[in-house]
UniProtKB/Swiss-Prot annotation:
Any single biological process term in GO: programmed cell death
Lineage, top ranks: Bacteria, Bacillati, Bacillota, Bacilli, Bacillales
Keywords: Cell membrane, Cytolysis, Membrane, Transmembrane, Transmembrane helix
Transmembrane segments: 7-29, 34-53, 65-87, 97-119
Function field: Inhibits the expression or activity of extracellular murein hydrolases by interacting, possibly with LrgB, with the holin-like protein CidA. The LrgAB and CidA proteins may affect the proton motive force of the membrane. May be involved in programmed cell death (PCD), possibly triggering PCD in response to antibiotics and environmental stresses.
Protein name (record): Antiholin-like protein LrgA
Gene Ontology annotations for the cellular component aspect, listed alphabetically: plasma membrane
Record-stated family: Belongs to the CidA/LrgA family. LrgA subfamily.
Species, as recorded: Bacillus subtilis (strain 168)
Membrane topology field: Multi-pass membrane protein
């Protein structure tokens, strides 16, 4: 059994800082307005999947940051509070748009999933039929004689 190597706080913070620096550069270059934090999450995920970064190298700091997530969302809550006038004026319309968009999204996702399942089912059935035809050519002769 090999023991996990323990990485220090500064090492983990440096890894996160480099990822955020690169993600800020990518977000600035890409013409699509994607937040640098989202680019950073995707970049970290890819680096972990490709085993460029080991989980142990970022796990402790990542867990610590996750435990602080409520505190990190306080600025968003304050921003909503600053927009309270807009929320009071258009609150019902905002809620209705969110509900309508959610229903449309769920419906479209369901229909698209059914379409993919039916197409993959047809392909599987066609593949099964071809396999049966190739495996038993004598059955085809019997069908022709009848």
């Amino acid at each position: 059994m090999s023991a996990k190597k323990v990485y220090g706080f500064l090492t983990q913070a440096f890894i996160f800082a480099v990822i955020m620096l690169v993600s800020n550069m990518i977000a600035a270059i890409v013409p699509i307005p994607i937040p640098a934090s989202v680019v950073g999450l995707v970049l970290l995920f890819l680096l972990l999947c490709l085993k460029v970064i080991k989980l142990e190298q970022v796990e402790t700091l990542g867990t610590s940051l996750t435990s602080l997530i409520g505190f990190l969302f306080v600025p968003s809550g304050i921003s909503v509070m600053n927009s309270l006038g807009v929320m009071q004026q258009y609150g019902l319309q905002i809620v209705l748009v969110i509900l309508l968009a959610t229903i449309i999204l769920l419906g479209a996702t369901g229909l698209f999933s059914q379409l993919i399942l039916s197409l993959s089912g047809k392909r599987k059935t066609e593949a099964d039929m071809k396999t049966k035809t190739v495996q038993s050519p004598q059955n085809n002769n019997e069908l022709v004689h009848h």
